C-alpha cells in the first residue's frame, strides 16, 4: 500500500475524530443553556438563554480575531502573536478542525461566568465581558498550558520543575478561569435582591424547572465525552513496543475515568445533601455530577479508574463545603458556578499532581515512548516536580484572572452598565430587557406579560 495513501487515511480519520469531538463540545452549550434556564427563576429564563447564545456568537468573533492567536501563536512563553484572524492557517501545526475544537472550549468559559452573575446583570455587560474573556483572558492561560512554548506546558522545551503542569482538558484552563471570573463578577455586583433577609439569613431562591436542569446535565455529560477524550486530538496513533495499544486505548480509558468521577460525585452529593437538608434534591445531585466532571478534567488521561473514583468523592465534598461557606459569607452565585467550576477545578489540579501515573503521562504527552522519564504523581512516588507545577498553575490562574476580570467588572460597575436597577430585578430581566416572559402562560394575572404593560406599570 502506498505510504502517502496510508498517511492521508490516517490524517482523515484523525480529522474526523477531532471534528466530531468539537461537535460534542459545542453540544455542551445546549446543556449549559438548559441547566442555566432551569436554575434561575422563570422571570429570568429568556435572559439566561440569550446569554448562552451571545457567548457563542461573540466568542466566535473574538476567538477568530485574537483568541486563537494569543493561545497558539508563536511568540513567547506568556502569549502568542501569530495566526490573527486565522492568517497562515492551515499550517504545519494547526488546521481548521483544531481551531473549531478550541473555539468550543473558549465559549464554554464565558458560559461558566454568566451563571455566576445571572438574574441581576445588564445585557451590555454580558457582551463586554464575554468578548474580553474569550478573546484575551482565557487564551493567555491556554497558551501557558497548551501551546508548545507555554511556560507551564508539559510539551515545551524547558519544563517547569522538569515536568510542566498537566491540565489535559482544562480543570484549570477552562473551569478555574471561568469560576474565578464569575467569583469576581458576583463579588462586585453583590447578592440578588432578597437573597438574604434583614438579619443576614439566606432566603431560598430555587430554580424554576428541575426538568431542564436534569436534561441539561445529561447533555453536558454527553458533551464531556468530546471534552475530555477529544483532547487527545488524534485517535489513530500507535504506541511503540505496544502493538495492540495506541491513543484509541487511552481515549477509552479517559472516557471511563470521566464517567466514574462524575458518577461518584453524584452519589456522594445525593447522600451528603440528604444528611444536610433532609431530602433527595435533584438539582444538588446534578451539580455534584458536574463537579466530578470538572475535577477529573485535568487528569482524566493520566490516572487509573480507581483514582477517578477518589477524585469524584472529594470533589463532591469540596462543592458541598464551598456552598456552605458561600452562604456563611453571603456570597450569591445562582448556579454555584464559582464553587463548582472554581473549587472543583482547583481540586482537579491538585489531584492530578498526586495521582498521575507515569505510563499514562508518557502515552498522553509522548505517544507512549518508553525511553523518556516523566515526573508522575506525588503519592505514586513521582516526586514533587509535577505537584509543584500544578500548584504554580493554580496560583497563576487565580492571580491572572483576578487581575484582569476583577478590574473589568469594577469598571463596568462604575460606568453604571453592570447591574440592573432593583425595580428591574424584582420585575425580572425577561420583561424589563427582552420584551416579555419566556413562559407567558405561567405568569400570574397581576404581573405584566409584555414589555408595554411593564412600562405602563412602571409609570403608575
Swiss-Prot record:
The chain crosses the membrane at residues 15-37, 50-72, 98-117, 124-146, 166-188, 209-227, 255-277, 305-327, 337-356, 377-399. This is Ammonium transporter 1 member 3. Belongs to the ammonia transporter channel (TC 1.A.11.2) family. The keyword GTP-binding does not apply. One of its GO terms (molecular function) is ammonium channel activity. Induction: Highest expression in darkness. NCBIfam families: amt. GO terms for biological process: ammonium homeostasis; ammonium transmembrane transport. InterPro entries: Ammonium/urea_transptr, Ammonium_transpt, Ammonium_transpt_CS, NH4_transpt_AmtB-like_dom. It holds the Pfam family Ammonium_transp. It is a multi-pass membrane protein. It is found in: Membrane.
